[in-house]
Amino acid sequence: MTHLLDKALRVRVRLGAPALAALALSLSLSLSLGGCTQLLRQPPPAGAPLAEVQAKLGTPRAVYRLPDGGQVLEYAGQPMGQFQHMATIGADGRLVSYEQVLTSEKFATVKIGRSTKDDILRTFGHPAETSRVAFHNYEVWSYRYKEAGVWNSMMHVHFDEGGIVQQMINGPDPMYDDRFRFR
C-alpha cells in the first residue's frame, strides 16, 4: 500500500491535482469493492449440499466439527471487516443455516463462566486481534463489528487460563476513530 501511495505522489507532479484525484478515487473504489465480494454473494439455499455451498462461497477459512457429526464453515471478514459469516452443515451434509454472526444479539448468547475458546471459535470464528491482560492473566480475543448495525465497535472476550470466558467488554473500534487510538 505504501508503494502505491509513493507512486501516486510521484505521478501528481506529472498529472496535476485533477488526475491525481481521479487516480485516488479509482484506487479507493477498487480496494473497497474487493473486500465486499463476500457481502455481495447470494448465500446458497437451506438444504443445499456441502459441495454447492463451497462452490458458491469458496473455501472456508476454517472448519469446526460439531458433536452431532455436522460442521461449521467460517467465511471470514476479520481482521479488518466487521462481518463474519458461518455456514452450519448438518450431519447429512446439507446447509442448515448461513448467518452473519458478529452482532450484539449473537454476542449476548455467550455464557460467562461456561463458554470455552472452542465454543467462541465455532460461534464467531477467528478474532481480529488477540492480546493479554496481565493483571488477571486473561487472554483477550477482539472482534470488530457494527454495534446495533451502526457504531464501529469491538467486542473483547476475556478467557482465563483454563480457556473459559470470564468477561466480555465492548467499546469503540480504534481503527475507525482517532480519539481511541493508542499513541
Functional labels for PLM-detected ranges:
Residues 33-35:
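C-terminal motif of bacterial Sec signal peptides marking the signal peptidase cleavage site
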Residues 14-27:
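Sec-dependent N-terminal signal peptides
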Residues 37-183:
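Residues within mature, well-folded domains
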Residues 1-15:
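N-terminal secretory signal peptides that target proteins for export/translocation
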